[in-house]
Each structure stands twice: as C-alpha cells, then as structure tokens.
Amino acid sequence: RQWGRLPAERGATVLITNHQHMDEGEMVTARTFFLHPWKPLVMCNSRRTFETGFIAWQMPWTGWFTRGLNLSGLWAAYNILPIENHLFSRPLISLAEELRSAHGDLPLEAILPGEALEPLGFKGRVLGDLWMPANFVRAHAWVKVAKLKQPYRREVLENLRAVTKRDIAAIVERVRTGATFYITPEGDFSHDGRMHPMRGGIVEALSPFADLWLCAIAYDPFRGGRLPMLYRVLRYTGSADIGTSLAAARPITTSALLAAFLLEGPRTFAAQDAVRAVRERLDLLPDNVFVDPELQRAPEAAVVSALATLRKRRTLVANAERYSLTARRADPRFLHIPDMIEFQRNMLDETLASARRLGQA
C-alpha cells in the first residue's frame, strides 16, 4: 500500500528509500514507472550483479549454462547502472575476475596468502579455476581486500576509487537530463531493524541540482496472507539528515507495536492483553508519526489476526487461551533476519527516536 507519489511534472529527481527486502525495488520502481511512463527512470545496483556468473550464484540450477554469462548489457538496457557497495570485502570470485582481466590467469597463491586459501581448498589453483562447477560455490567466500598480497591490494584499492568516481559520474550525467533516480543509500538489507548509515556520495553529488524525495518502507509480516508492504513517498524537507527523516517517515504497523509488547510484556498473556497493550501504545504515539490506517481503524482485528499468524508459524504457542513466545522467530520471506520479533521492535524504537529528533529540529 502506498501513500503519496512523485509529481507528474518533475525534473531531475532522487527517490531515496530504506532497504529491508529484495522485492521492494521492483515494486516501487514499477509503480513509479507506470504512474508516469514518459519520465525516464534510472536505478543502480551492486557491481556484483554485473559480474560473470551472477545468475548462476543466485539460481544454482542454471549454473551449467550461466556460470560464464555476464548480464551487463541487459542491465544497461533496463537503465540499471553499476555502483560498488562492497568497499572492504568482496567475494573471492569478484576479485579474481578483476585481477584476471588485468593480469591473466594468475595462480591464486600470487594474490592471497596460503592461510586464506587453505580453508577453501584452492591451493595450486589459478584464477580461472574458480568458475569450474566443483569450485564455483566456494569461490563466493568473502575475502577482505586487506588480505590481498601487494601489489594487487594497492591495485584493487586504486581501482575501487576510480570505479566509484566513474560510477557516480555516470549517474549524475543521467539524472541531469531530467531522469528520476531510485537509490537505497544503506547499501545492504537491515538485519536487526535498525537502518545502516546512509552513504552520502551519490546523493551529495545529485543534491545541488535534483529534488530529493523519500520513500519510507515498512513491512507488516505478522499480518496474514501476502506480505504487506507499506510505504510513503514524501518530499525531503532538509530539516534533519536523510537517515533520520527516512526512519521517522516509516509507517508504524501492527507487527511493530505487537513485537514491542511480546518482548516487554508478561511471559504469558491472553489475546485481549495484547490488544489492550497495542491500543495503549497507539494512544501514546507522537503526532508526527504515520500509523497504518487499517490498524488505527480496527486495532483489535489487526492484533488478533497477527496473533493467529504467529501461532501458525509457531512463534507463539497457546495453552488454555494464553499465549507465550517461543524461540522460532524467523520469517522465511526474510532469510537475512534471524529474529523478526526483535527486528520489528528495533525498527519501532528507531522510528520513534527519529520522530522525536525531527520534532526538535
């Protein structure tokens, strides 16, 4: 569900969003495009997606014919530009592709010390061996750039600076023509509900001539049925930093308020205890936060539905009409989040703290 939208008559625009799930980029950009299809829309994605074998890593069953496939041309056709978002560590195969293109099929011992290669079983191998079926999965082990031997470490770091500068220049050139640019400056998914620091390089390069807008996203994973994604599109006012403004603008959901009760309330509780606690928390929310209208309109129905969902997932167990929280707190739709209860509570705390800071600004 969406509240707010970009204006139809707009020039160079940056749409800045937080990052929790892989589907949000497709959803937001598709809706943005179909609302105003005559407006060019540009996105960026990690350079990992522009590397040979990306599809084989994401969809292993295709590996027999995609390990040597590079999709850079396809991404360019869809107005997706590359950006380097892994500054200190990268998959070994990513470093290997860069160094192989510059130096040929070097022995792996030439670029990494033996203690880094031995756990992976790559002693005696050359760079090109990493794309072999038997090695491909292990070749995606993450390696700190600092572990590289000289002169390759220095070369990779120098290339990182040059590539980043070139990537940003390409984005600036496209947006300056009047395009709308979708970006997630966090770089990676949040794992604990708290947003990562906003990386400012691209936004700082665009802000002198482009209008900045926020796309503040929250999910409501404890509600039944399809995963509810709630987001607001609103103009960035500049009254606080982008991270604070984005966090404060996220919709407050049933899942977030219920999670706070589950972690802070009694060990066992009745359904009406949870309903009462969520109602009380709703009444105490500051005026400058946005609450899911469905929750505001019918809090009891929303909480009862969420309790039923959590019981089906065995996150809650019921005994004599009283619930208790279990250790099964993951959600299969968010594989990067080990504890969705804690995630939702942390997100609520950060949203409220950001709203307070915004109110004082």
Where are these regions (language model features)?
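Short coil/turn segments at beta-strand junctions that form active-site/ligand-binding loops
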Residues: R10-T13, K39, T177-A179, A210
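Catalytic micro-motifs at enzyme active sites that drive phosphoryl/nucleotidyl and oxygen chemistry
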Residues: W3-G4, G63, G68-L71, A170-I171, ...
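Non-catalytic C-terminal accessory region of glycerolipid acyltransferases
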Residues: R90-A361
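A short, well-structured juxtamembrane/interface segment
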Residues: R1-A12, A170, R174-T177
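Broad hydrophobic/π-residue packing in well-ordered secondary structure
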Residues: Q2, M22, V42-M43, R48-T52, ...
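Generic low-polarity alpha-helical segments
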Residues: Q2-L6, M43, L74-W75, I80-L81, ...
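Catalytic core of membrane glycerolipid acyltransferases/transacylases, capturing the structured
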Residues: T13-V156
